[in-house]
């Protein structure tokens, strides 16, 4: 059975059974704005709970954008295995366009302890 949660993770993680989760897909706040919802979470607490609830071959897949990508990667460098690049169809950051390039991609970081099931996908040009 698949069970999805859409809530503040610190409300639900403590209530999830040990070793019962295959994957956590997270879109953490990147701390790139001054908005109240965009503040850095307690990554140490997150990894403690994630390690408790993930199955042995479970993984965490998380979106990020620099400079948060570096913060997230270093928060669990031991289990960081690889990164995907999410190429966006429309760049963002128009208000800062005179100061820096607009942001046309995000990072997707993949963390795990033991290799989960992986089905390679062949694509043209790769």
Write out the residue ranges for each language-model feature.
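Core catalytic lobe of class I
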Residues: 1-126
């Amino acid at each position: 059975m698949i069970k999805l949660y859409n809530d503040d993770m610190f409300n639900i993680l403590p209530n999830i059974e040990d070793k019962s989760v295959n994957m956590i897909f997270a879109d953490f706040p990147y701390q790139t704005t001054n908005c109240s919802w965009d503040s850095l979470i307690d990554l140490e607490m997150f990894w403690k709970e994630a390690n408790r609830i993930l199955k042995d071959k479970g993984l965490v897949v998380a979106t990020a954008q620099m400079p948060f990508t570096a913060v997230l990667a270093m928060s669990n460098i031991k289990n960081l295995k690889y990164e995907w690049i999410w190429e966006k169809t429309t760049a963002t950051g128009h208000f800062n366009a005179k100061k820096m390039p607009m942001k046309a991609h995000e990072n997707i970081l993949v963390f795990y302890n033991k290799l989960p099931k992986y089905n390679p996908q062949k694509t043209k040009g790769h």
